[in-house]
UniProtKB/Swiss-Prot annotation:
Transmembrane segments: none annotated. Keywords: Cytoplasm, Methyltransferase, rRNA processing, S-adenosyl-L-methionine, Transferase. Pfam families: MTS, MTS_N. The keyword tRNA processing does not apply. InterPro entries: Mtase_sm_N, rRNA_ssu_MeTfrase_C, RsmC/RlmG, SAM-dependent_MTases_sf, Small_mtfrase_dom. The keyword Lipid biosynthesis does not apply. This is Ribosomal RNA small subunit methyltransferase C. Monomer. It comes from Pseudoalteromonas atlantica (strain T6c / ATCC BAA-1087).
Length: 343
C-alpha cells in the first residue's frame, strides 16, 4: 500500500504526466509504478526505499532511473520535482537548494508531507524560490504545495552545508563532519558520549559501527586502536557521506557501507558498537533495532561482543537477554543505559 503522502501526490497525477520529473526521498518505492509518466526519476537518501524502488522497477520491466546519493548531480535538467518533506527543517532547506539547481527555468516544485511532519511550513520553505506558492491539496492528514521557480537560483555545493566539529572523549580528540538530516547534526549527543566513555578496549579485528550517523563511534574506535578494521554502516546517504568525510578528517581507514539493517553486510565482526535508531521519519519505529538484535548473532565472531547505548525507556534488555548468552549493564544514567552483550 502506498504511503499517505504518495496517495495525495497521485490525486494530482496529471501534473506529472508531461516532461521529466524527479521524486526526492519518496516514502515508498511503489509510487513510481503507479505513475504513468516513464520519465520520472528517483533521488533517494534512504537505502531501504532505494532498494524497494529498484526492485519495483525491475518487476514492472521499467528502467531503473534511481540514484542513492547525498546530493543530486545539478547537471541534470528536470521540468519538475516532488519533495517529500523531511523531518528536519534544515534538511528540507538543503534539499530544496539542491533540487532547484536541477530544474529548468520556470520549473515546477511540489512539496508533499504529513501534517505532523511540518508540511504547513512548506510555503515558507518555498518562498526563496518562488512568488507563486499555492496549497493545492489536503487529504489523509497530509498536504501538498506547488510553486513555479521564478526567482534566481544559486549553484548548489553540499560542502557549504557541512559542519565540522571537534570533540574530546577521555584522551582521544576527533573531528566530525555532519550535515542537516544526520542524527545529532553538529553535536556529540549524550548517549553516544556515554557509550564512548565505556569503551575500554577496541580489538585489532574487524569491528562495526552500526547506524553510524556521522561516523563518531567508528572514528573513535579507529583512533583508539589503529589496528582495528573499521566498518561503518547506515541506511542514510547523508550518513554515509559524513562518515566517509569524518574518517578522512581523522586519518581513519574505514569501509563505509549503505545498508538496510544488516542486509548488505557480509562476514563477521569481533566487536559491534551502536547507538541505534528508534525513529523512521517522524514515526517511532523499533523494527530496525529489534531486527538488528535478532540477526546480529549471525554476524558476530565466537566470543564477539556488542556494546549498545539506548534510552532507558526503550526497554531493550529483555530482547538482548533472548538473543545473547551474556548481557551486562556497563553503566546507566537517568536517561541512558549502556549494555555489553556476548555470544
Amino acid at each position: 500500500m502506498l504511503s499517505a503522502a504518495s496517495q495525495v501526490l497521485l490525486r494530482s497525477e496529471e501534473l506529472l504526466e508531461q516532461g521529466k520529473w524527479l521524486l526526492v526521498n519518496p516514502t515508498d518505492g511503489h509510487v513510481f509504478s503507479a505513475l504513468s509518466n516513464p520519465e520520472v526519476y528517483g533521488f533517494h537518501q534512504f537505502f531501504d526505499i532505494y532498494e524497494q524502488s529498484i526492485a519495483s522497477a525491475k518487476a514492472q520491466g521499467r528502467d531503473t532511473q534511481h540514484q542513492f546519493v547525498a546530493a543530486y548531480d545539478t547537471d541534470a535538467s528536470f521540468d519538475g520535482a516532488v519533495l517529500y518533506l523531511p523531518k528536519a527543517k534544515a534538511h528540507g532547506q538543503m534539499l530544496l537548494a539542491n533540487i532547484v539547481a536541477c530544474l529548468k527555468p520556470g520549473g515546477t516544485l511540489l512539496v508533499v508531507g504529513e501534517n505532523k511532519g511540518g508540511i504547513k511550513s512548506a510555503a515558507k520553505l518555498l518562498t526563496p524560490y518562488s512568488d507563486n506558492v499555492n496549497k493545492i491539496d489536503s487529504a489523509r492528514h497530509c498536504a501538498m504545495f506547488a510553486a513555479v521557480v521564478d526567482k534566481p537560483v544559486a549553484s548548489f555545493d553540499i560542502t557549504k552545508w557541512q559542519d565540522v566539529s571537534e570533540h574530546q572523549v577521555a584522551d582521544i580528540s576527533f573531528k566530525v563532519c555532519s550535515l542537516p538530516g544526520v542524527f545529532s547534526h553538529g553535536e556529540l549527543d549524550t548517549g553516544t558520549q556515554l557509550l564512548l566513555d565505556n569503551i575500554d578496549r577496541v580489538v585489532s579485528g574487524r569491528i562495526l559501527d552500526f547506524a553510524c550517523g556521522a561516523g563518531i563511534i567508528g572514528c573513535f574506535a579507529g583512533l583508539k586502536n589503529p589496528q582495528a578494521q573499521v566498518v561503518m554502516s547506515d541506511v542514510s546517504a547523508l550518513a554515509i557521506y559524513c562518515s566517509q568525510k569524518s574518517a578522512e578528517l581523522n586519518g581513519v581507514k574505514a569501509q563505509v557501507i549503505p545498508s538496510n539493517g544488516l542486509g548488505a553486510l557480509t562476514g563477521k565482526f569481533a566487536q559491534v558498537f551502536t547507538n541505534p535508531p528508534f525513529h523512521t521519519g517522524i514515526k517511532t519505529d523499533y523494527s530496525v533495532t529489534e531486527g538488528f538484535m535478532q540477526q546480529l548473532k549471525n554476524h558476530l565472531q565466537d566470543r564477539g561482543s556488542l556494546i549498545l547505548v539506548a534510552n532507558k525507556f526503550l526497554r531493550y534488555a529483555d530482547e538482548l537477554d533472548k538473543q545473547f548468552k551474556s548481557v551486562q549493564t556497563l553503566t546507566e544514567t537517568t536517561k541512558f543505559s549502556v549494555y555489553c552483550c556476548r555470544r
